[in-house]
């Protein structure tokens, strides 16, 4: 399902040589999951009648704040592959069979939306950065996407695999570096994710699988990144600077392993606290790169990958942010769930809408943040154009 995007009117001029976001598109699978109906439908399809699990899932569905998600996995998928809902079944082959095709198709659809908004020919794309934690094969989805879009066989490709929730901003950082160091280049960045690899029947020994069932969704996003926009292009965000760091000795807090049954995840209960304890210093380092000591955190617009609602609440409290500052992150979580690497761009799309409504009163500077395995912090200082 393609999601329409539109061209924004430029309000400020980008600094010479700085990478900008020239267009953004997204795509979602056709299967819509309403959180209100999830519990009964999910348990019925996987043939689970455990009342304790039902109660826990109902509680999680309310606490995640998610209202709607989109998934590749459907009733038809489970009927075709019933072993996906069978405990202990070696199903990695079937999962990859579904996921490999699905992630490229969603990336293709998001790219079409993005390229249409951009308004230039596909032949003008010089580089491709392809991000996914949901497929595994050689050659990778970057090659299949290039062929499907009709990109030049000399397009310069980069793949980023299995980064999780911070993958979108990592891809954006790589795209920024490419754009700023290759004059005239235009970089297509795509992110595409599906929960098919991690779908598991509920088990009391694996409580995190229920969190996944209540929180995660599927989808794709695509952006065109380039420096020194032409008259025909309409940049809406300048990528002023990027920063990444990991927290030492936290490798086990977010743990994912590929097995014969798919991907298994473990999430430490101390994740929100670890982020809260370290986020203020990280943000202040980024803000300092704006070259203005007068900027306060509440002077900025914010695009924060939510992970889950506890991370947003902790960050808001720690940084003393006004409630409206994280509204776009909360609405994206509500509308799509946690869509891993895509989520930051769904939020950025909502931020774009809000800044357009504010017009000249909109904030000039903002922060983009995402957190993932490592624990890795990925951040951007951005400028509203």
UniProtKB/Swiss-Prot annotation:
One family from Pfam that matches here is: Chal_sti_synt_N
The protein's UniProt keywords, in alphabetical order, are: Acyltransferase, Developmental protein, Endoplasmic reticulum, Flavonoid biosynthesis, Transferase
Q: In which pathway does it act?
A: Secondary metabolite biosynthesis; flavonoid biosynthesis
**Gene3D superfamilies registered for this protein in UniProt:** 3.40.47.10
One Gene Ontology cellular component term attached to this UniProt record is: endoplasmic reticulum
The enzyme class is: transferase
Question: InterPro entries, per this entry?
Answer: Chalcone/stilbene_synt_C, Chalcone/stilbene_synt_N, Polyketide_synthase_type-III, Thiolase-like
Q: Name one GO molecular function term.
A: acyltransferase activity, transferring groups other than amino-acyl groups
Q: Which amino acid positions bind substrate, per UniProt?
A: 217-218
List the EC numbers from the record. Answer: 2.3.1.-
Q: What does this protein do?
A: Plant type III polyketide synthases (PKSs) that catalyzes the condensation of malonyl-CoA units with various CoA ester starter molecules to generate a diverse array of natural products including long-chain alkyl alpha-pyrones.
Name of the protein = Type III polyketide synthase C
